[in-house]
């Protein structure tokens, strides 16, 4: 059996196996256990009572977290005319059409979110092989194909997170960083859970939100007592 590192031993001593943690206690413990030199993200995994093999039970959406994620988000927008001016005014890092597509084809993909107005999809459609594998392809289901590009830019900059269920029916997303106020983290997670409940597939039966786990980038996962959340 492999020896545990000092960090692994410290984590093992602090965590109670099988325990469901009050959210605020879990956030405090994860912060205490974070010893890496960079600011770790705090992530949440939500196990949903869905069958991801059924197309009508795939959960895919986006949520604007009230306190953001603590990350600087770079946004590119495909649009033109007055909408382009509105996107720039809303804080977009780059706005264009064919010129922007050419840059991306050449390898300039230093963006976290790509947004497009419907009339720009003729240009964006050429970029499927470039944007798709990076999870950047605009999609109306998560609000990144929209005539109101300015609002989409503001949402992205404010800390909107996008997610979809994986093959096990779990959604994963970042909800903040180590050092965030625990109450703000809690409110971010509550906003996410409220949105997940709002878009619950009609064909999903039984318990919908089965398990919520909070973790840091390099740290352990703590199961959250759902009774400690208001969502």
Curated annotation (Swiss-Prot):
Keyword list, A-Z: Repressor, Ribonucleoprotein, Ribosomal protein, RNA-binding, rRNA-binding, Translation regulation, tRNA-binding
UniProt entry tagged with the keyword Glycoprotein: no
GO molecular function: rRNA binding; structural constituent of ribosome; tRNA binding
Record's signal peptide: none
Origin superkingdom: Bacteria
GO-annotated biological processes: regulation of translation; translation
Any one GO cellular component localisation term in the record: cytosolic large ribosomal subunit
Keyword RNA-binding among UniProt keywords: yes
Gene3D superfamilies: 3.30.190.20, 3.40.50.790
Subunit: Part of the 50S ribosomal subunit.
Functional description taken from the UniProt entry: Binds directly to 23S rRNA. The L1 stalk is quite mobile in the ribosome, and is involved in E site tRNA release.
Similarity remark: Belongs to the universal ribosomal protein uL1 family.
Name the UniProt record assigns to this protein: Large ribosomal subunit protein uL1
Designated gene of the protein: rplA
